[in-house]
Regions:
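Key DNA-contact positions within bacterial/archaeal DNA-binding proteins
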Residues: 18, 29, 58
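Alpha-helical residues within the helix-turn-helix
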Residues: 22, 33, 51
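DNA major-groove recognition helix of helix-turn-helix/homeodomain DNA-binding modules
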Residues: 44-59
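Short basic helix-loop element that most often maps to the first helix and adjoining turn
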Residues: 4-23
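Recognition helix of helix-turn-helix/homeodomain-like DNA-binding domains
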Residues: 25-40
């Protein structure tokens, strides 16, 4: 089950896991576990990742289609 989009965002921005690990002050193995969805970052780490990558936290946990569909559902009610 895919729970986060960190890998996709890293790929889109051309950023390596090693680079992110260094800027997050985490081990490569920790970041790799996030990227491979073996473990999930806590909210504090997710916020740090979003700031480092320059994206909204929502971009790390859902793709554009999911956000679009979610907005459609909210607007119909």
């Amino acid at each position: 089950m895919k729970l986060n989009r960190i890998k996709e965002v890293l790929d889109e921005k051309g950023i390596s896991q090693t680079w992110l690990a260094k800027h997050l002050n985490k081990s490569y193995n920790s970041v790799n576990a996030y990227v491979c969805n073996r473990t999930q970052p806590n909210l504090e780490n997710l916020l740090q990742i979003s700031k480092i990558l320059g994206v909204d936290m929502k971009d790390l946990i859902s793709d554009a289609e999911e956000r679009f569909n979610s907005n459609d559902i909210k607007q119909t009610f």
